[in-house]
Amino acid sequence: MSIRVGQKAPDFTATAVFDQEFGTIRLSDYLDKRYVVLFFYPLDFTFVCPTEITAFSDRFKEFKELSTEVLGVSVDSEFSHLAWTQIDRKSGGLGELEYPLVSDLKKEISSSYNVLTEDGVALRALFIIDKEGIIQHSTVNNLSFGRNVDEALRTLQAIQYSQENPDEVCPVNWKPGSKTMKPDPVGSKVYFEAI
């Protein structure tokens, strides 16, 4: 199944680890009032993955201020997730996280988002899902390099701005407070004349 921006995000129910406990997560429970940053990573106890997972946790408050939940997903079991969160960061673990890690042991979530490799691990994919459950943004990195949390936040802010201001669009490198433009031949000239 191919999944694209503008389509409904595949719902899922799965076991997750949060606050050193197991719980059930359903994507649709997060929607209606909040956006969701759903990111996939290859495996627990690896090398690039903890740098991304902890970076999202360290910046979680900024996502929360934007009415956004963060969910991390890998094909590991909830037991593996729990063990990894019980190891401190300086020893290659995750320590306490501000958001749940979802277990996709059966690889159903990774498959439904079309991010599963032939080797059976998820690529470094990130989806920003709006309150209506529509995928507004997706990126997929290969396994050997991590994502940019600043860019995820900036993209989220641009999505929210454009949804709140449907008569405007956000040009390259847009950040809150930057100029936007009207998406028409006359209105866009105001933007281009100012740069």
From Swiss-Prot:
Belongs to the peroxiredoxin family. AhpC/Prx1 subfamily. Residues 3-161 form the Thioredoxin domain. This is 2-cysteine peroxiredoxin, chloroplastic. Keywords: Chloroplast, Disulfide bond, Oxidoreductase, Plastid. It comes from the Eukaryota. Thiol-specific peroxidase that catalyzes the reduction of hydrogen peroxide and organic hydroperoxides to water and alcohols, respectively. Plays a role in cell protection against oxidative stress by detoxifying peroxides. One of its GO terms (molecular function) is thioredoxin peroxidase activity. Induction: Up-regulated by high-intensity light and H2O2. Down-regulated in the late stationary growth phase as compared to the early stationary and exponential growth phases. Pfam families: 1-cysPrx_C (PF10417), AhpC-TSA (PF00578). It is found in: Plastid, Chloroplast. PANTHER family: THIOREDOXIN PEROXIDASE, THIOREDOXIN-DEPENDENT PEROXIDE REDUCTASE, MITOCHONDRIAL. GO terms for biological process: cell redox homeostasis; cellular response to stress; hydrogen peroxide catabolic process; response to oxidative stress. The lineage of its organism: Eukaryota, Sar, Stramenopiles, Ochrophyta, Raphidophyceae. SUPFAM superfamilies: Thioredoxin-like (SSF52833). Homodimer; disulfide-linked, upon oxidation. One of its GO terms (cellular component) is chloroplast. PROSITE patterns: THIOREDOXIN_2. Its EC number is 1.11.1.24. It catalyses: a hydroperoxide + [thioredoxin]-dithiol = an alcohol + [thioredoxin]-disulfide + H2O. The active site is at residue 49.
